[in-house]
Amino acid sequence: MIPLAFGVGSALTALVGRAVGAGDWHTARRTAWVGAFLALLIAGTAGAAVGLAPMQFASLFSGDAEVVAIAARALSWVGPAFGGFGLGMALYFASMGAGRMRWPVAAGLCRIALAAGGGWVLANVFGMGLDGHFLGVALGITAYGVVTALGVRQGEWPGR
C-alpha cells in the first residue's frame, strides 16, 4: 500500500504547498481531499480484494500451509482497513505541504497505540488470541486515516 499512497501523497505535498504559498487555502484543502479520496479508492479496492480472497493472496508469498493460514487470518482482518491507510498517508503528505503536521503525528501515535496496546488488550484481556492482534492493527490503520482527516478541515487549515 505504501507505494500507491506515496505516489499520490508525494504529489500532494507539492500541489498543496504551492496553493498554500499562494495563500489559497481553499484550493489547498480541495486538492488534499481529492488526492486523499483517490488514495482511499485505490487502497480500499486493493484491501477489499485482499480481504475477500486472503488465502489466495497469502499463498503468493509462501507454500507453507501454516504460514499461509496465519497470513490469511491477518489479511482477512487487516485488508478491509487498507483504505484508511491510503487516506491517512495521502493526507499526511498533504499536511506536510500545508505545514500542518500536528494531526498527522497524533494519528501516527494513535495507530501505534491501537495496534500494539489495543491488539494486546483484545488478544489477552478479551481472549481473542492472534485475531485480537490483527484486529488491533486494523483498528490502528483505520484510526490513522480518521485522525489525519480530522486535521484537514477549515478550522485546522484556515490560513496563517
Outline where the language-model segments fall.
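Short loop-to-helix capping motifs
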Residues: 64, 100-101, 129
